[in-house]
Amino acid sequence: MKVTNLSEKEERGGELTEAEKEELRKSEKGAIIELLVPVDTYLSAGVHIGTHSCTKYMESFVYRVRAEGLYVLDVRKIDERLRIAAKFLSRYDPQDIIVVASRPYAYRPVQKFAEVVGSRALVGRIIPGTFTNPYLSTYIEPKVLLVSDPRTDTQAIKEAAKVGIPIVAFADTDAKIDYIDLIIPANNKGRKSLALLYWALARQILRERRVIPPDGDLAVPVSEFEMRLVQ
């Protein structure tokens, strides 16, 4: 599916100085840390760009606030949560993982993630009762749910919470995290950001499962995870 005429949060306004980039390559104690993705790659995709509002739940993931009020996420914490989420999700049978996306820019990343990992993808509107009504033809029983945006994937979240399914979510600075069990702070609105996030998470899950070596890469490039635009 291709998308056009949609407002995308581009990777503008979140530029960092070289000193700040260098700081993000180090732990709080000053030691160089090895990220899943180089700092410059994270930044060029805009994974760190938040919104102009921040809920109390997301404050601990903020790196700084720009003069115009834009909240900027800490890529070290994004990276850390990607690792934690990958380790957690790798414990499940792939077919028991459902990944959902109501926001169009997340459709292709979610579908490619499911293809690579072996999980199941649900994009677009979630039919009420999908997780709760066994009489529906669309009824499924996942063991864990991965959502692209708590603000738009509300139907899936409510149903998963009702039946006790653990929920992992990509959450921007404006997110309300009711029912979310594991947060991955990130720009979940940008096309390039979503592609990189789902690609990095898929790769790390395969590493955790030992499908690929600890330093192995996916056969599928990040570009294949990116939602295509109509010219």
Curated annotation (Swiss-Prot):
Disulfide bonds: none annotated. Residues 1-23 are annotated as: Disordered. GO terms for biological process: ribosomal small subunit assembly; translation. Keywords: Ribonucleoprotein, Ribosomal protein. Residues 7-23 have a biased composition (Basic and acidic residues). CDD domains: RPS2 (cd01425). It holds the Pfam family Ribosomal_S2. One of its GO terms (molecular function) is structural constituent of ribosome. PROSITE patterns: RIBOSOMAL_S2_1, RIBOSOMAL_S2_2. InterPro entries: Ribosomal_uS2, Ribosomal_uS2_arc, Ribosomal_uS2_CS, Ribosomal_uS2_euk/arc, Ribosomal_uS2_flav_dom_sf. One of its GO terms (cellular component) is cytosolic small ribosomal subunit. Belongs to the universal ribosomal protein uS2 family. This is Small ribosomal subunit protein uS2. The gene is rps2.
